[in-house]
Swiss-Prot record:
One of its GO terms (biological process) is protein import into mitochondrial matrix. The keyword Nucleotide-binding applies. Keywords: ATP-binding, Membrane, Mitochondrion, Mitochondrion inner membrane, Nucleotide-binding, Phosphoprotein, Protein transport, Transit peptide, Translocation, Transport. PANTHER family: MITOCHONDRIAL IMPORT INNER MEMBRANE TRANSLOCASE SUBUNIT TIM44. It comes from the Eukaryota. Essential component of the PAM complex, a complex required for the translocation of transit peptide-containing proteins from the inner membrane into the mitochondrial matrix in an ATP-dependent manner. Recruits mitochondrial HSP70 to drive protein translocation into the matrix using ATP as an energy source. The modification Phosphoserine is found at S180. It is a peripheral membrane protein. Its main location: mitochondrion. SUPFAM superfamilies: NTF2-like. GO terms for molecular function: ATP binding; protein-folding chaperone binding. It is found in: Mitochondrion inner membrane. This is Mitochondrial import inner membrane translocase subunit TIM44. The lineage of its organism: Eukaryota, Metazoa, Chordata, Craniata, Vertebrata.
Length: 452
């Protein structure tokens, strides 16, 4: 009963428990670390039970253990430092180290003494040389040598002044000026004919009209007059010229077949055709005018009657550097006033119509030309109104048209189009200045996308 009461936490027989409390508690196997307290405040009996863990250390005991461990470590560290100092002291006091120090000090002292001796010897030698030079300068031979050196210096100075004055006089002579102008002219021709062709394409700083052409300066210094006897033709209006040219182009089967074959020939990427193209171009340049009289020779002869200074190579260079860039840039950028000045009326209407429609819808032209190459004179044709030269060339163009929001409406800024152009340039008989006499009579183009 007592055990049951104890397990329930309350004892129902206080007297009995008090009488045999010690015996009762000792007769039970209690858990390790448990303690029981029986008290009687007043007449009530209270049994208190508490437990403590015997295996868990207290905070103070753990702290003491840590302090002991740190002290043990410090002791080991002190012993290690002491041993290191002892070893260093033994090394410091060793005979080998003492001997090495003595040798180093002796070498250092010898070096200092040697440097001082060399310095002293140099001072003595300098003084001796100075005294010897003073003695030589005071002697007759020394004075003569000194006077000779001074005389040579004066002579050299006078010679330099004389050469300078002679150079100035030579530069003012007419012969020297003529030679200088000739050298400058040759250099300018080389820059224009060689360097200008091999360099990359550059857009003109400002698109110019024919009247603003670079040859306008030439126009001021010369007066051009028409040779009516040599010409033997009557001047006509643009509409009649264009109509005659259009009839010839549309109805002549040989002309159309020729250009169809030439376009395929020029656009071919075949290695053999490209090699043969270079060979045929060279042979044509060398032997083109040695045989029978051709229509091209008649056209060139007619041009020479009007303009005796005309040259085929110079004309092609003019097309590549001025005529083609101005017209082509005006076409892709929508510069209508430039086109109107360079083109005949019918050609201008044909080119201006799509540009005017695009501008009316608010579109913007952002196309650009990357390169112009292979400018060639294909053929010539004598028309009633005057000579017409057919010029072919290739151009690499990026075609881009954007709307008012800046979005790409047509074209692709990342795609390069290789264009093959055929232009018919007619010499304006009303314009006597050869640098502004050529106008665009007709234009034809075909395009292919360039992969590389």
């Amino acid at each position: 009963m007592a055990a049951a009461a104890l397990r329930g936490g309350w004892c129902r027989c206080p007297r009995r428990c008090l009488g045999s409390g010690i015996q009762f508690l000792s007769s039970h196997n209690l858990p390790h670390g448990s303690s029981y307290q029986i008290s009687r405040p007043g007449r009530e009996l209270t049994l208190t039970k508490s437990y403590s863990s015997g295996s868990r250390k207290g905070f103070l005991s753990g702290l003491l253990d840590n302090i002991k461990q740190e002290l043990a470590k410090n002791k080991e560290m002190k012993e290690s430092i002491k041993k290191f100092r002892d070893e260093a002291k033994k090394l410091e006091e060793s005979d080998a180290l003492q001997e090495a120090r003595r040798k180093y000090k002796s070498i250092e002292s010898e070096t200092v003494r040697t440097s001082e001796a060399i310095k002293k010897k140099l001072g003595e030698l300098t003084g001796t040389v100075k005294e010897s030079l003073d003695e030589v300068s005071k002697s007759d031979l020394g004075r003569k040598i000194k006077e000779g050196v001074e005389e040579a210096a004066r002579t050299a100075k006078q010679s330099a002044e004389s050469v300078s004055k002679s150079g100035e006089k030579l530069g003012k002579t007419a012969a020297f000026k003529a030679i200088s102008q000739g050298v400058e002219s040759v250099k300018k021709e080389l820059d224009e004919s060689v360097l200008g062709q091999t360099g990359p394409y550059r857009r003109p700083e400002r698109l110019r009209k024919r009247t603003e052409f670079a040859g306008a300066k030439f126009k001021e210094s010369k007066v051009f007059e028409a040779n009516e006897e040599a010409l033997g033709v009557v001047l006509h209006k643009d509409s009649k010229w264009y109509q005659q040219w259009k009839d010839f182009k549309d109805n002549n089967v040989v002309f159309n077949r020729f250009f169809e074959m030439k376009m395929k020939y020029d656009e071919s990427d075949n290695v053999l055709i490209r090699a043969s193209r270079a060979l045929t171009d060279k042979v044509t340049d060398l032997l083109g005018g040695l045989f029978s009289k051709t229509e091209m020779s008649e056209v060139l002869t007619e041009i020479l009657r009007v303009d005796p200074t005309f040259d085929k190579d110079h004309f092609l260079h003019q097309c590549e550097t001025d005529i083609i860039p101005n017209i082509l840039e005006a076409m892709i950028s929508g510069e209508l006033d430039i086109l109107k000045d360079w083109c005949y009326e019918a050609t201008y209407s044909q080119l201006a119509h799509p540009i005017q429609q695009a501008k009316a819808l608010g579109f913007q032209f952002h196309s650009r030309i990357l390169d112009i190459s292979n400018v060639d004179l294909a053929m010539g044709k004598m028309m009633e109104q005057g000579p017409v030269l057919i010029v072919t060339f290739q151009a690499q163009v990026v075609m881009v048209i954007k709307n008012s929001k800046g979005e790409v409406y047509d074209g692709d800024p990342d795609k390069v189009q290789r264009m093959l152009y055929v232009w018919a340039l007619c010499r304006d008989q009303e314009e006597l200045n050869p640098y502004a006499a050529w106008r665009l009579l007709d234009i034809s183009a075909s395009s292919t996308e360039q992969i590389l």
